[in-house]
A protein has these predicted regions:
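A recurrent flexible, glycine/aromatic-enriched loop bordering the glycosyltransferase active site
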Residues: 125-145, 149, 164-166, 194-195
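Glycine-rich, basic loop-to-helix element that forms the pyrophosphate-binding segment
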Residues: 56-74
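Acidic helix N-cap motif at the loop->helix transition within catalytic regions
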Residues: 16-18, 39-47
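Short, well-formed alpha-helical segments that are part of the catalytic scaffolds
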Residues: 10-26
Length: 209
């Protein structure tokens, strides 16, 4: 999948990142932005996964700045921003690509979500693609040429609300955001687990301040 680069923003994610990475097709480019100076983490990942580049930030940048850094390194047409506590299904990327080529004018595509709490988050036909106002940031598929005017995440946000702000700015420029029920991404811990990751990042930032 040379049209897609996956960007994963991590912070002390050693215990969950391998499940995520093992679910990704080995030919797909992956950029990890690790919010620390953990050289062992970088070396271990780059040795095990030849499709992966790990950037060490040396400090906790947060969701917006970390993902923007990763996106600045992307050279492909599309990027998938993925949480480290999410895993792809075997046809996730293929389904994203099929929909992307069909729609062509979209800015963001979002998946249906499956986790232990919610096996079917949207009670609609599973083949349906429909426009939405915003998406959950645990997995968002970006059509990068649609972001030249808007930019990516506002770095004034450290944790929470970044994806909502981005979606609002996209909508203000008449950019289109879709949810595709055919695309399934498993969110391992569900929303509460994701909040724990964000809470750890927030605690770390406050501690350093």
């Amino acid at each position: 999948y040379d049209k897609i680069t996956i960007v994963i923003n991590t912070f002390n994610s050693d215990d969950k990142i391998h499940l995520c990475l093992n679910s990704i097709e080995s030919k797909t480019k992956v950029i990890i932005v690790e919010n620390s100076n953990n050289v062992n983490f970088k070396d271990e990942l780059e040795k095990k996964y030849t499709n992966l580049e790990c950037i060490l930030t040396g400090q906790n940048l947060g969701y917006a700045k970390g993902n923007n850094l990763g996106l600045s390194k992307v050279k492909s047409k599309y990027a998938l921003i993925l949480n480290p506590d999410a895993t792809l299904s075997k046809d996730t990327l293929e389904n994203f690509l099929v929909t992307a080529e069909k729609l062509s004018d979209f800015a963001i595509l979002g998946p249906a979500k499956q986790d232990e709490y919610s096996k079917d988050e949207y009670n609609i036909d599973k083949n349906q693609i429909f426009q939405v106002n915003s998406l959950n940031g645990f997995a968002i598929f970006l059509n990068l040429n649609q972001f030249k005017e808007v930019g990516f995440f506002d770095e004034n946000f450290f944790i929470y609300l970044e994806e909502i702000d981005l979606c609002k700015r996209l909508k203000s420029k008449n950019k289109k955001i879709y949810l595709d029920k055919k695309v399934i991404i498993n969110h391992i811990g569900g929303s509460s687990h994701n909040e724990n990751i964000n809470f750890e990042m927030e605690l770390s930032r406050n501690w350093h301040w």
